[in-house]
């Protein structure tokens, strides 16, 4: 009967642990994400041949003055990049207010019909001056998209004339680490693409993009003329953080030609002027999710989690737990069957 008790206790324990895993609570999810981080940290670095970074760093501040610069300075950098024959120019910067230094017209001239994509941000306030983008839908994707109360967009002149306006928001995991990035978000019935999707759309010259959903969520999306992008049910992709990029200071105009033919992202890196985000590989500048997600899509190497992965995890949890309990109960049975003779157990 005691052996039966051991078996019963062991079996109940395995069932409880398996149900604990099935509920996918904080502990289980954190363990899963940390194991994902270990894989990312061992991933071989790959240098991008498609994307270059121009940084607003300390050297640039010494040359152009304190940030934010007069927008005519940014306009000058854009024209220098265009003169260097770069590809799409991405400014993951909010231009939600007019320039108090009266440089808006010069920047408008630089971004209008010039292959420039600028940023906007989802907001918890109900402002709706963002710039949505037309989308062809197969079934209704809205119930599955991350939703914001409002969208903090650029000033109307910039929003109407820039070739692209994309969302900059990240959605960190439960432990605050950025591992996935939504390619689409919503406000009400309006859908807003990420800055990576907008960059690809502008690069191929398409006015819109396509998204397909089913009863389980978002299935895939596509910019016409470009391969299908597999996402999770909430239109997110897992970021593969193994990318490195050619990086040049905004002060080094004479080196811009080194980025010829590449998509160029203008990112703020000067101390005190940018937020650092947590990634599986440590702290990153806040323009990096845009750069990494764009490179992942271009390479077609977005990380995917198979639909059967959760069932495989449950099966493994049950099998390993059952094996451990089997060994434990066997030892317990041996202990019960042993006999003490003369101080010795046989």
Predicted region positions:
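Non-transmembrane functional regions of envelope-associated proteins
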Residues: 2-224, 259-324
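Short gly/ser/thr-rich secondary-structure transition/capping motifs
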Residues: 36-37, 247-250
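A short, sequence-level motif marking secondary-structure junctions
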Residues: 185-186, 244, 329
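A structural detector for beta-sheet-dominated domains
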Residues: 212, 224, 240-242, 342
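Active-site Gly/Thr loop motif
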Residues: 228-247
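Surface-exposed ligand/attachment interfaces on beta-rich extracellular proteins
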Residues: 255
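Conserved small/polar residues in nucleotide/adenosyl-binding loops
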Residues: 328-335
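Hydrophobic alpha-helical segments, chiefly the membrane-spanning helices
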Residues: 340-346
């Amino acid at each position: 009967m005691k052996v039966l008790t051991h078996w019963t206790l062991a079996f109940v324990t395995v069932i409880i642990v398996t149900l604990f895993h099935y509920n996918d609570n904080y502990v289980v999810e954190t363990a899963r994400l940390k194991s994902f981080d270990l894989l990312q940290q061992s991933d071989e670095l790959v240098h991008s041949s498609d994307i270059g970074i121009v940084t607003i760093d300390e050297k640039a501040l010494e040359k152009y003055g304190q940030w934010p610069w007069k927008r005519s300075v940014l306009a000058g950098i854009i024209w220098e990049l265009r003169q260097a024959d770069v590809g799409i120019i991405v400014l993951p910067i909010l231009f939600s207010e007019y320039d108090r230094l009266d440089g808006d017209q010069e920047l408008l001239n630089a971004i209008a019909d010039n292959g420039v994509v600028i940023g906007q941000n989802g907001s918890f306030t109900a402002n709706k001056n963002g710039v949505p983008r037309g989308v062809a839908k197969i079934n209704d994707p809205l119930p599955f998209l991350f939703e914001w109360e409002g969208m903090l967009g650029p000033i109307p002149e910039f929003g109407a004339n820039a070739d692209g306006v994309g969302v900059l928001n990240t959605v960190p995991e439960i432990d605050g680490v950025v591992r996935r990035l939504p390619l689409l978000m919503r406000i009400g019935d309006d859908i807003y693409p990420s800055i990576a999707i907008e960059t690809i759309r502008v690069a191929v010259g398409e006015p819109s993009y396509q998204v397909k959903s089913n009863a389980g969520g978002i299935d895939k999306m596509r910019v016409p003329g470009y391969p299908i992008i597999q996402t999770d049910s909430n239109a997110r992709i897992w970021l593969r953080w193994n990318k490195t990029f050619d990086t040049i200071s905004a002060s080094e105009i004479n080196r811009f030609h080194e980025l010829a033919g590449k998509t160029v992202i203008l990112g703020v890196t000067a101390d005190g002027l940018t937020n650092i985000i947590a990634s599986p590989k440590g702290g990153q500048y806040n323009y990096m999710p845009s750069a990494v997600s764009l490179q992942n899509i271009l390479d077609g190497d977005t990380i995917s989690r198979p639909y059967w992965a959760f069932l495989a995890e449950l099966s493994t949890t049950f099998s390993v737990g059952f094996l451990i309990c089997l060994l434990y109960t066997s030892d317990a049975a041996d202990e019960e069957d042993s006999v003490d003779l003369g101080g010795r157990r046989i």
